[in-house]
Amino acid sequence: MGANLSMPRQPGANKSLQPVKKPTLAAVLIVKNEADNLKACLASLDGLVDEIVILDSGSQDETPAIAAEFGARFFVNTVWPGFGRQRRLAQSHVQSEWVLWLDADERLTPELKEAIATVMANPASDTIYSIPRLSWVFGRFIRHSGWYPDRVLRLYPKALT
């Protein structure tokens, strides 16, 4: 059974409808000697981000090669200016409209990827999103004493910075 829908004619109704443009998203990391962690972190981003920006603080391991394997835009700054300044420097290399910060030892779960994709389908341009972080200490996740969910601000439009 088909449906026959008609819309009232409006001025400009002959203009073709344009698809809504999805904003671009960059994953951004600052790293040093993270070869043991980086591959799994970057693999967890597959299909979600438009660019990966990595600012390296002077790795002596395979970190640069792993970043290249994932097509990351890789920059180096070995003069450590402090955590905040290093993050701002990394973000200055971002070309995307939105920023997702990660540490190399973090992974996106399938549920978190889906939640981020949902937000990115129709994001609020004036909102900074927090992500629940589950900490792993001494071989166990910490889910007590107020440690979970440890919410961290990680997803936001670059224009807000």
What does each of the following model-derived ranges do?
Residues S44, D56-I66, V79, D103:
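A conserved acidic beta->alpha catalytic loop
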Residues D50, P64-H93:
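Conserved donor nucleotide-binding strand/loop of the catalytic core
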Residues P8-Q10, G84-S92, E97-L102, T109-T161:
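Catalytic-site signature of metal-activated, phosphate-bearing donor transferases
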Residues G2-S44:
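N-proximal low-complexity "stem/linker" segments adjacent to membrane-targeting elements
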Residues L29, D50-G58, F75, A104:
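Short beta-strand/loop segment that forms part of the nucleotide-sugar
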Residues N14, L38-L42, Q60, R85-R88, ...:
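A generic local structural motif
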Residues K39, D61-F70, E111-L112:
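Acidic helix N-cap motif at the loop->helix transition within catalytic regions
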